[in-house]
């Protein structure tokens, strides 16, 4: 408990003891009333002050005003005990609500407790702790075992395992060594690391994430906006209704020649006010969304606002950019077909001829061969745009490229039966075979598609710039419903616009990309999801939902968290309104007394807040 919460608890206990003491005492009359005022002011002075300030500001219609009018009115009618009890129980509910909200905020703070307190800089042979915001780009910082990396950078010295769970939600440590990039917010588990910073603290990963989480409450869901507007209309409406309930029936009775019974009707009106307090809704709905966003962040899913969390539950179509989302974006040798030599020799000719090239295919060929390239053995290399390259390896003329290069050299290559990227090789003018490469499908990609179907997604679509055969093979392997290939970035935007027109009423479209090359499409979709955004400023800026690692299965998890959060929100709305409606009717016709009003108000608030805190664990299912 905070200091303020402890103070409020003491006030409640002291007031409750005094109320019971006066209740059981033999005192009656004005002396009893004066004694009841002592616990009343101890427990309720802050509510009365807020109500008075609200009146002077012209913002009188809130829960403080309702409680002040109800309790003062009850005591004015001689119901001293009831007036005190209403204030005590209301403050018990407020304390419980404050504790629940604080606990949820602390839970999220713990989950997102990634802001470093200091950075170590070597000075005069000793380590000096400085504020991370004072560290300039290019400074070498030292991170000891157990410390959090304060700023993004590159390891210059040392080797260690780092825990990235605060960013990605994954518990498996990552090994880093000299030359590797490291991100702020990760914890060094072993070994001393010297890191040269590549960004200022304000531009580092940890600062970007913290800013995103802190500002997520600014973008409200429709359910939250509904409650805000509802409370703005509802509170004045019940106040005017209470006035009407206190005045109209007695006036009607007077006109009809009966006793007006002012006391009875004013008591009913005051009971009506206590029951009508909208605290349960006003508090529990934002708390539910806050908890849902926190639960998602614990799993490495950053949602930029409760409006996007709500939208995820309504997603009917998910469109994927293939490379980097469903596939790793790394070429891998799938098959070889050598002619007159073994596969290793064929790979050797191709890899050595490609030794100077930085193209991803060249890197894949060198990796598949696994041998040590001696550049002194490679001469006369000439890259031919749109064809491939030629060169000499140990004096032998080697050509590596596509079918057009072979035909240009007068060689008729053999076509592979399998779809993929084909590299043909010729040595000394003789066809030597082909090497088939393909983008590697991510381990959990097929599971991710199945998970989306299980969450109610009606259609999955894959967009790619790859050739049609290769694209259809990947789509078939993963179970994607539709695929569009050989697309330029502008074509992808047009495809998404077409799909937006075709979607079913009330269903939304989500686009999943890497967040770097797909910014126009991410912006055009109803929900832009950037995947593998760890360390990518562009991804965090462009998307509505950011997945901090490369696991596509987390898209379905995000939808599951969204659905559970919304279920909790709707449970609270229906429960609170139903109980309030019944009790308001009972209060208006005189069946519900002040004690039932207290129970209805505090009980509904406590149960709604308890239910709302379940949203924090939504990602743990």
Segments and roles (model prediction):
Residues 2-3, 20-29, 48-54, 72-77, ...:
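Membrane-embedded alpha-helical bundles of multi-pass transporters
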Residues 51, 79, 100, 119, ...:
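Residue-level signature of catalytic and energy-coupling elements of molecular machines
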Residues 1-14, 234:
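N-terminal membrane topogenic signal
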Residues 52-61, 99-109, 287-306, 613-621:
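Juxtamembrane helix-loop transition segments at the membrane interface in multi-pass membrane proteins
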Residues 22-30, 35-118, 122, 134-141, ...:
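Actuator/coupling domain of P-type ATPases
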Residues 13-17, 225-256, 268-289, 570-599:
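Bilayer-spanning, highly hydrophobic alpha-helical transmembrane segments
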Residues 110-111, 138, 306-517, 521-527, ...:
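Cytosolic catalytic headpiece
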Residues 62-67, 107-123, 296-322:
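Membrane-cytosol interface motif
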